[in-house]
């Protein structure tokens, strides 16, 4: 018998009552989602998003460095700290504008600024450094849409195109009184470019075996990973257009498999060590 219970952060003390925790809220390190994921893992629950995935995915600076170190294609970029303010003019001499400046833990296009000049680079860096010790400066890759590849335990669940908001360079436009977003297209993953799928799978292998949404840009034959999201959207009528209810059944089946695996007694070797 499967009992599902919708809980909130007020139920953190009850986590030991459950076998699994499925977090459906944007995660952050300084947040109850991080605390509850760690506590759930400590209590032996199956967890999505697990603490390791949250730690690796929510920090764009760390993720960029990880991707580059492991040979996963990512936009060209520079990691900046506050002491770099004095050398921004020198750095600007080596750049082609526009560039994109990001805080480590931005989400839904927040904390991401398009930089069009060296003067704006200095101005925006000073502003963002007021709240963040590190920033990521990356090349700007204009595209009509971003790919979002949904992956669970190394298997592709969905392939979507998220289009830029009308008249804006990002998927989400926060410039007005309300947030606007672009359209979408979800397709059978078999129809998505093989290079996009393979690159997304390579990226998630660096993170874990949980549920991820990999954002990629494609420009001609070039495919780069923008980020790996540990808490991807699963919206009715968007990401589930192809699989329908089977999308959610596959996720629940993964939880069940992991829970049953945890319940299996560990086999203790009965082999005796050879005597001398």
Residues covered by each model-derived region:
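Phosphate-binding site of ATP-dependent enzymes
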Residues: 113-204
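Rossmann-like NAD(P)H-binding beta-loop-alpha module
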Residues: 75-98
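ATP-grasp fold ATP-binding core
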Residues: 67-68, 92-111, 132-147
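Protein kinase-like catalytic core scaffold
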Residues: 99, 157-158, 212, 224-227
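A short beta-strand motif that forms the metal-chelation/ATP-contact edge
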Residues: 18-23, 149-152, 216, 222-236
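A long amphipathic alpha-helix within ATP-dependent nucleotide-binding catalytic cores
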Residues: 171-222, 246-265
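Conserved N-proximal alpha/beta basic substrate-recognition cap immediately N-terminal to
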Residues: 4-76
């Amino acid at each position: 018998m499967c009992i599902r219970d919708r809980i909130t952060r007020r139920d953190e003390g009850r986590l030991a009552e459950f076998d699994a925790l499925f977090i459906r809220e944007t995660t952050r390190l300084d947040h109850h989602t991080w605390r509850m994921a760690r506590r759930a893992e400590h209590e032996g629950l199956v967890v999505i998003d697990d603490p390791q995935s949250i730690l690796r995915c929510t920090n764009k600076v760390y993720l960029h460095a990880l991707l580059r170190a492991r040979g996963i294609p990512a936009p060209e970029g520079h990691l900046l700290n506050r002491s770099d303010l004095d050398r921004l003019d020198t750095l600007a001499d080596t750049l082609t504008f526009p560039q994109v400046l990001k805080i480590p833990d931005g989400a839904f296009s927040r904390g991401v600024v398009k930089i069009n000049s060296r003067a704006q680079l200095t101005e925006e860096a000073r502003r963002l450094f007021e709240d963040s010790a590190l920033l990521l400066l990356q090349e700007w890759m204009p595209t009509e849409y971003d790919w979002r590849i949904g992956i669970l335990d190394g298997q592709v669940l969905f392939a979507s195109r998220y289009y830029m908001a009308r008249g804006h360079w990002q998927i989400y436009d926060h410039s007005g009184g309300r947030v606007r977003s672009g359209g979408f297209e979800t397709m059978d993953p078999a129809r998505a470019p093989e290079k996009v799928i393979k690159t997304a799978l390579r990226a998630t292998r660096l993170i874990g075996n949980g549920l991820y949404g990999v954002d990629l840009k494609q420009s001609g034959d070039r495919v780069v990973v923008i980020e790996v999201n540990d808490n991807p959207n699963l919206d009715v009528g968007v990401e589930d257009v192809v699989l329908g209810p089977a999308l959610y059944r596959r996720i629940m089946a993964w939880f069940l498999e992991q829970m049953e695996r945890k319940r299996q007694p560990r086999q203790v070797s009965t082999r005796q060590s050879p005597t001398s």
